[in-house]
A protein has these predicted regions:
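Basic, flexible Lys/Arg- and Gly-enriched helix-loop patches that mediate nucleic-acid binding at interfaces
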Residues: 2-180
Length: 180
């Protein structure tokens, strides 16, 4: 909320995401709920811009610190582990495997409960956005074990697109691996 000619203002929700407090949407919710204080005043307005070098910002009574180093964790998610960092049903999550990490990290993308494989966790919101945003067209490769052989119509359906929660996905390429 302070402006100087040499300092770049940033949206408050973006700053909170960069500092590992919450995702941008999560930060918006915190702002709407009055959990964020800038220079001693509760902020409810979404889209507000702040000067990270000057403004005093706290969330839920805790002052946020300067930008921490970005962390990137490659995790081989086992089956029957929830990709989220917490689970209201009390199931095992990837957070249970993280131990003591000095900053909040989050998974980039997700793997289903009964899936296993590489999952990247980070506190770098910009990197996560680059990897996951459809406009960036980052290719992801999945190896899938099936019972039996897929029918031609099923492969065509994968190539033309399949509706899943959150949108439609389609394979660019489908092939049977030799020796599998």
């Amino acid at each position: 909320m302070t402006m100087t000619s040499s300092t770049k203002l940033v949206r408050l929700n973006k700053l909170l995401a960069e500092r590992g407090i919450a995702s941008r949407r999560g930060a918006d919710k915190m702002i709407e709920e009055g959990m964020v204080v800038v220079n001693g005043k509760k902020v409810y307005e979404l889209g507000i811009k702040v000067n990270p070098n000057v403004d005093k910002i706290s969330v839920d009574g805790k002052t946020i610190k300067g930008k921490s180093e970005n962390i990137y964790i490659m995790f081989n998610k086992p089956k029957n582990v929830n990709t989220s960092m917490n689970d209201p049903l009390g199931r095992v999550t990837v957070a249970d495997f993280m131990g003591e990490i000095p900053v909040r990290v989050f998974p980039i993308g997700r793997l289903d409960w009964d899936s296993e494989g590489l999952l990247i966790l980070t506190n770098d919101g910009e990197y996560a956005q680059k990897v996951m945003h459809p406009k960036k067209e980052v290719t992801k490769t999945y190896h899938v074990k099936l019972e039996g052989q897929p029918q031609l119509y099923q492969i065509k359906k994968l190539l033309s697109g399949v509706a899943i929660p959150g949108g439609k996905v389609k394979a660019k390429h489908v092939e049977k691996l030799k020796g599998v």
